Amino acid sequence: MAVQLCFQEEEATVHLRRFSCKGSADCPDLSHSAGLLESFLCGTPARDYVYQSVPYETQIQQAAQAIADADCVLIGAGAGMSAAAGAQYGGDFFEKNFGEFQRKYGNDPYMQDMYSAGFYPYPNEESYWGYWSKQAVLGGIKLDVTPLHRKLLDGLSGKDIFVLSTNADGQFVKAGLPQKNIFCIQGDYFHIQCAHACHDRTYDATAMFLQMDQARRDCKIPTYMVPRCPVCGGSMDMNLRKDGYFVQDSAWYEAERCFGDFVSRSLDRKLVLLELGVGFNTPTIIRFPFEKLTREHDNITLVRLNLDQAVIPESLGNRAIGINADMAESISDILNVSVSHPYPAQER
């Protein structure tokens, strides 16, 4: 049995829907790691959130010391990390790069940024892929590695690290972190799948998106370029968790296994949960689980960086640090501050 995750944020609970994989090689039975992920995910928010009344410089010193003392670091990266690194989705960027879509479809509420435009009810598949191919190219394929991602990984060099990310831009791979150290639980901009999940496999669409980007006219791609499912002959879709048909393929389950292994071996070591730009859009994946782990294990320190949502459960005391400031500056300050090193960092 494989596990598909379905989230209902209104009730702040996590629901799991199981479906048979029919024993396919693309969807192995990983019930142990699935159980770990299920126990990790948490839909319960804290009841005692506070903005910590501690000077910024003190928080930076505390965060830097916690990371220096840690054996391992689990990074939880949300949309705020990409934004802090310079990624742009709306405003002048959207108008400049997607102005033709705004003119064609009008000043629709959907046509305000790259997030909302993905949910626009495009009239046909030529138009649908006309939009999504451009978003994939600009938001992932041609997006250079950001200095912030590179600086972060360089600053954690020598630590045992793993990244759990809800971002689709592939930045941590581009920054040099091995794929085995990354779990992109929500999918990415580089793969497509059967729109109705008739089989458990995804397909690298990088080359296809680049070709679509060149062939697009009047916001549409030629009909012959519309991808079809090689199994059922039906429509294809982005491999992004946006509905109940998200495909979790063998690579997804391998990433889940690596994540589970990292968490298991880290629970009896000094572990820092470094949460970067995670808000309340999908808090059941990173924010709430990080709080739950910190509550349950005295050896864990939570470091939460966010522009304006770095509230911390007061009950976590000095094992949680919430830095409410420009995240790029906070990361730079943490990595640059002088700290004591009680013992050498372990090799990754």
What are these regions (language model features)?
Residues A2-R348:
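Conserved catalytic alpha/beta core of Sir2/sirtuin-type deacylases, generalized to analogous enzyme cores
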